[in-house]
């Protein structure tokens, strides 16, 4: 797999893949309900991150909010102007062991 032009997977693609997986297991669930579950899942992730909770999915990874220190000498890449960046919070993802091992095996 080349990392220069990687295929992009959208939420609709994921919904289609989950729908196919469900049908392959002889179950029926309309795509609109799959989309509702995915939307609710992401809303819960956002809500918990905004509450400064750590979200852990064993073997997949952990989501958390971290504080990033500000800098005095950051540069605006469009104008080249030096700007001051204040301390701020960022969402951070730390991959779990299984995900690390699976991604490590990707051929580039």
Swiss-Prot record:
InterPro entries: Hist_DNA-bd (IPR000119), Histone-like_DNA-bd_CS (IPR020816), IHF-like_DNA-bd_dom_sf (IPR010992). GO terms for molecular function: DNA binding; structural constituent of chromatin. Keywords: DNA condensation, DNA-binding. GO terms for biological process: chromosome condensation. The keyword DNA-binding applies. It holds the Pfam family Bac_DNA_binding. PROSITE patterns: HISTONE_LIKE (PS00045). Disulfide bonds: none annotated. GO terms for cellular component: cytosol. Signal peptide: none annotated. The keyword Plastid does not apply. Histone-like DNA-binding protein which is capable of wrapping DNA to stabilize it, and thus to prevent its denaturation under extreme environmental conditions. PANTHER family: DNA-BINDING PROTEIN HU, DNA-BINDING PROTEIN HU-BETA. Belongs to the bacterial histone-like protein family. This is DNA-binding protein HBbu. The gene is hbb.
């Amino acid at each position: 797999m080349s990392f220069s032009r990687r295929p992009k997977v959208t939420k609709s693609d994921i919904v289609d893949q989950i729908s196919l997986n469900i049908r392959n297991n002889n179950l029926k669930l309309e795509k609109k309900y799959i989309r509702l579950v995915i939307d609710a899942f992401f809303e819960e992730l956002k809500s918990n991150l905004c509450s400064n909770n750590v979200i852990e999915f064993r073997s997949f990874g952990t989501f958390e909010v971290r504080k990033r220190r500000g800098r005095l000498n950051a540069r605006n890449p469009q104008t080249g102007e030096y700007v001051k960046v204040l301390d701020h919070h960022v969402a951070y993802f730390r991959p779990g062991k299984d995900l690390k091992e699976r991604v490590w095996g990707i051929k580039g």
